Amino acid sequence: MKTETDFFDQATIVVRAGNGGNGAATFRREKYVPRGGPNGGDGGRGGHVYLIADPEYNTLLHFRYQRKFVAENGGHGGKNAMHGRNGTDVYVPVPPGTVVRATIDGVTYSVDLARPGQRLLAARGGRGGLGNIHFATSTRQAPRLAELGEPGQELTLELELKMLADVGLVGFPNAGKSTLLSVISAARPKIAAYPFTTLTPNLGIVEVGLQRFVVADIPGLIEGAHAGVGLGHDFLRHVERTRLLIHIIDAAGVDGRYPWDDYEQINTELRLYQPELAQRKQVVALNKADLPAAQENLPILRERLPVAPEDLFVISAATGEGIEPLLRRVADLLRADPPPQRDPVDPDEPPLQWPLPEVDENAFTIEREGEAFRVRGIKIERLIAMSNLDQDEALDRIQRVLEASGINEALIAAGVQDGDLVRIGRAELVWDDSGQHAL
């Protein structure tokens, strides 16, 4: 069945994973056991947010109506060492061919979801907090210490769909691309005699005998498109994944340009945008052959264009002249160069993750922040986030970690003075010279 597709190819969404559940501080109620003994269970993990390449989708239109996706928080731990329930994961469908970008710690990362079923762990759920059962020692037999759940990750994602069309129609505005697409498929693009009538790609399914392929009408390119002139970047990126190009030229020169110059300029823009595009297989369609000016130009075009005769076609999208042999040639070329196999992903295949560099979680930095000192580090900031700062046992634990990790020593070397503020995550501690630590 021939179809028309509305196109929506860029979107910005926010994904927020669930927070981990809090650990419990509970005690057994048994005779002869001090305070009953700790038996608080751990909190559950917060739900993850995944993006999944779903072949049922072919645009990003659904993100026009929903832009924020939030996973469930983990359940809190309970008595009798009961573990909290893990939060339910959220799966956000995107069309295959979607490139996902996120900026994490000032660095932008991208992941390509090209294969059906491919998943990206976009936002990781927070760890569940440990219950007090983990903090019992020979000297602390009834600890009231339990961790809070770790906050879930929240990211803003930029989505860009690079279409998976087989054939791209390229050419100057008003060369006749939209008219041709409307003739060879059931697509109904907007058609009018002024530049940039087509501002988004239109897709059409073309049938040649038993063969079917997808054709994309790439919005008209102009000189300077590779540098973004005339929305050039928005247009050119859709050419990247096509297997073959039909280069349509207004052979009549209706807009006052020389048709042979149009050919050179479009190929120059393709080459400057991405050198590989200049090597992409092309067939050239000299359109508007029903006009007298085109008939006058055809001998010159055949002589000047560096195109093999079998790849040069004289057509009229308005009358249908020459279209059938053009499509047969396109079908033959596609059949001779099948697309790379994109088998669906095995459901057991692990999800893709952001390609973050390996880091030492124990590492930390100290910098001045006005009159205060700011300590940054993955492990120490996670500890702060998962600590109840109103609880004495939690503060004692933080102090032990600051001392054991070398942070206190580094603060002294950085010039911390009695009464100075020391900020770590959400915590503001006051340095105490007498004890050589922050409180």
UniProtKB/Swiss-Prot annotation:
SUPFAM superfamilies per record: Obg GTP-binding protein C-terminal domain, Obg GTP-binding protein N-terminal domain, P-loop containing nucleoside triphosphate hydrolases
OCT domain: residues covered: 356-433
Binding-site positions, GTP: 171-178, 196-200, 217-220, 287-290, 316-318
Domain Obg: residue ranges: 5-164
Cofactor requirement: Mg(2+)
Superkingdom as given in the UniProt entry: Bacteria
Gene3D superfamilies listed in its UniProt record: GTP-binding protein OBG, C-terminal domain, GTP1/OBG domain, P-loop containing nucleotide triphosphate hydrolases
Subcellular location(s) of the protein: Cytoplasm
Pfam families membership: DUF1967, GTP1_OBG, MMR_HSR1
Enzyme class at the top of the EC tree: hydrolase
Family, as annotated: Belongs to the TRAFAC class OBG-HflX-like GTPase superfamily. OBG GTPase family.
Summary of the function given for this chain in its UniProt record: An essential GTPase which binds GTP, GDP and possibly (p)ppGpp with moderate affinity, with high nucleotide exchange rates and a fairly low GTP hydrolysis rate. Plays a role in control of the cell cycle, stress response, ribosome biogenesis and in those bacteria that undergo differentiation, in morphogenesis control.
Protein name, UniProt field: GTPase Obg
Originating organism: Chloroflexus aurantiacus (strain ATCC 29366 / DSM 635 / J-10-fl)
